[in-house]
Amino acid sequence: KTSTRTRCAFEVAARDQGAGVTYLEPSASQIGHKESIKDTARVLGRMYDAIEYRGFGQEVVEELAKYAGVPVFNGLTNEFHPTQMLADALTMREHSGKPLNQTAFAYVGDARYNMGNSLLILGAKLGMDVRIGAPQSLWPSEGIIAAAHAAAKETGAKITLTENAHEAVKNVDFIHTDVWVSMGEPKEVWQERIDLLKDYRVTPELMAASGNPQVKFMHCLPAFHNRETKVGEWIYETFGLNGVEVTEEVFESPASIVFDQA
């Protein structure tokens, strides 16, 4: 997958530590097309000390890790976004003023993919009070939920999944969301997704429903919060929404810490 923040973060971090970086564009690589993942892994593993992969299937990054012989970092797959979790955990720690195991956060929206999955597992592993607010059809898979509950038994985390957005955000320190339509999905899914998720939009009213005047808003970006992008304008013209998963008022408010997070 193409990238802005993830690529820049990896390249800046590597160069700050004195490492060289090579970027292979999706269109310029033969991975999985003319050369198998297994063969590519064994070639790159002989040239590089580490590999960062950002793509679609989790099975690809796992196969790279199996055969490369060097560390492989998951920069994002459809299923997980672990390096974003490092940023999210640090951001919550910086802004909460209390230990993570005393911190509560909610994720509202489509929770089936990398951010919903990863935040649920993150909260469980760190002993946090983590809530998912979404229609049940958009919850993480049973396997992810089971893994979160297993981790929570070890850490004392509290896991809540609910279809009630206001219940999800009650007394939390942070409210997370993400885009409602993921990269690679067709435009045709927008109407269905908007119908399903309209009650999970992060608005000033939902922020207030937390009952916490210090609650913070988080989003891994990019966000559809206004009409200033081609997609944002198309959504407005097609569905009448100025901002989708979050309103401009929340995104640009003092409660928004998305740029610290990103």
From Swiss-Prot:
GO terms for molecular function: amino acid binding; ornithine carbamoyltransferase activity. GO terms for cellular component: cytoplasm. The record marks E94 as: Important for structural integrity. Changing V60T: In strain: HF116. This is Ornithine carbamoyltransferase. The gene is argF. Its EC number is 2.1.3.3. InterPro entries: Asp/Orn_carbamoyltranf_P-bd, Asp/Orn_carbamoylTrfase, Asp/Orn_carbamoylTrfase_sf, Asp_carbamoyltransf_Asp/Orn-bd, Orn/put_carbamltrans.
